């Protein structure tokens, strides 16, 4: 009898195991990591774009320049002024109004997203694109330019093309923009990389990182594929947008005469830029005419320009005017830095280079901090700390993770120097 009961239990256990195996097989099939069939799931705007029914300016329409793009009403209450200036501040408030029921292609300006990526970045980049489209670009259908030092493959082009609601364009970086200039001693550069590896300096050992920083500093804006645009928004893989942007952010930049905008700022690793400031001072001494009146020298230097405090705008999020990078002042500044060799003999990043240039060559009123966007790039978060702002912008971020008012952030200094009013409740997020 005991043997019969044991056999029965074994049979029941065997049946149960078969059921579990079957369920596991079904779940595995349902959660396959194979790429989705974008041809079947792409948006109508993307489909029309791929079939040639979208106007040259991008967006969903009948193909005429004045085609209308239907848009829904802004959701939730509207903050009166998210970026209002405090006493003495000169910054214009970001308008928080309903988008019209229709938004014509003629309302758009000459602007594009710009992404530097490799084919291997595809699916981490796809998440970034989804964030930007859902939070902003599905309303405005701006173009997206992708740059690579190698050819993009068909999978990359087809996948991003199905996600972007505007036109997608792909540019191959010229060899001379992604290689050593003739005056660089490559043996010396290799020795520096090895020394930085031993010191465990972040990206200090990387050759490709240096080419990337030099490219973003001096060549991305020279790409012929960008000649048709006046403004850009830099987007990288693995970023997140946490809040709705219900106004045309490019048009706002133009209408308010802004040339550079950021969401996060912090000090640079001093070990990567030991001579960057001295090299900058050499340039300024020879070219004082390029210093802007009412510049932000006091943001990048605590001693009236003697030394650099390391503060820089985090360049993985940039919205800016391409005219600034194309200007004589910036071109000559980059050429001076490039000849000095610090991109390879040290590890100069594009973020401090861009930031120093913007701080010195632009009036401070042309630089803007977007505190209503909600942005993440590992490991830092920008999240509006004012609860009413988060509700109005439909943000899904945790204000306790906001970096803006922390002691290590340079944005607090930016607010203080400009005498800007801070967000309601900021004091609770400083620790």
Curated annotation (Swiss-Prot):
Keywords: Glycosyltransferase, Golgi apparatus, Membrane, Signal-anchor, Transferase, Transmembrane, Transmembrane helix. It comes from the Eukaryota. Residues 29-431 are lumenal. GO terms for biological process: cell adhesion involved in multi-species biofilm formation; cell wall mannoprotein biosynthetic process; cell-cell adhesion; cell-matrix adhesion; mannoprotein biosynthetic process; N-glycan processing; protein N-linked glycosylation; protein O-linked glycosylation. One of its GO terms (molecular function) is alpha-1,2-mannosyltransferase activity. The keyword Nuclease does not apply. Pathway: Protein modification; protein glycosylation. InterPro entries: Glyco_trans_15 (IPR002685), Nucleotide-diphossugar_trans (IPR029044). This is Glycolipid 2-alpha-mannosyltransferase 1.
């Amino acid at each position: 009898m005991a043997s019969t009961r044991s056999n029965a239990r074994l049979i029941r256990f065997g049946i149960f195991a078969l059921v579990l195996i079957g369920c596991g097989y079904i779940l595995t099939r349902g959660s396959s990591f194979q790429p989705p069939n974008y041809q079947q799931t792409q948006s109508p705007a993307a489909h029309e774009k791929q079939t040639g029914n979208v106007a040259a300016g991008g967006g969903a329409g009948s193909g005429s320049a004045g085609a209308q793009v239907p848009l829904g009403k802004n959701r939730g209450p509207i903050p009166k002024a998210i970026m209002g200036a405090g006493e003495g501040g000169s910054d214009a408030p970001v308008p928080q109004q309903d988008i019209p029921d229709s938004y014509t292609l003629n309302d758009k300006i000459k602007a594009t997203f710009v992404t530097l990526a490799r084919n291997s970045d595809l699916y981490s980049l796809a998440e970034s694109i989804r964030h930007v489209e859902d939070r902003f670009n599905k309303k405005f259908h701006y173009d997206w330019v992708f740059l690579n030092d190698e050819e993009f493959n068909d999978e990359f082009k087809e996948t991003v093309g199905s996600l972007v609601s505007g036109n997608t364009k792909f540019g191959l970086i010229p060899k001379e923009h992604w290689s050593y200039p003739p005056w660089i001693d490559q043996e010396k550069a290799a020795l520096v990389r090895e020394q930085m590896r031993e010191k465990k300096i972040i990206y200090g050992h990387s050759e490709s990182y240096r080419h990337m920083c030099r490219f973003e500093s001096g060549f991305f804006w020279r790409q012929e594929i960008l000649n048709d645009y006046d403004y850009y928004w830099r987007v990288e893989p693995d970023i997140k947008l946490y809040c709705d942007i219900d106004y045309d952010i490019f048009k706002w930049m133009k209408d308010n005469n802004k040339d550079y905008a950021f969401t996060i700022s912090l000090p640079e690793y001093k070990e990567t830029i030991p001579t960057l400031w001295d090299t900058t001072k050499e340039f300024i001494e020879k070219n004082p005419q390029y210093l802007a009146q009412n510049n932000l020298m006091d943001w990048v230097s605590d001693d009236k320009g003697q030394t650099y405090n390391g503060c820089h705008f985090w360049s993985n999020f940039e919205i800016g005017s391409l005219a600034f990078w194309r200007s004589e002042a910036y071109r000559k500044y980059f050429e001076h830095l490039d000849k000095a060799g610090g991109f390879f003999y040290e590890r100069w990043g594009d973020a401090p280079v861009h930031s120093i240039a913007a701080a010195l060559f632009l009036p401070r009123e042309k630089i803007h901090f977007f505190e209503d966007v909600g942005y993440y790039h590992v490991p830092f978060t920008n999240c509006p700390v004012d609860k009413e702002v988060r509700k109005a912008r439909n943000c899904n971020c945790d204000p306790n993770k906001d970096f803006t008012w922390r002691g290590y952030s340079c944005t607090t200094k930016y607010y203080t120097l400009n005498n800007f009013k801070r967000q309601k409740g900021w004091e609770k997020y400083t620790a």
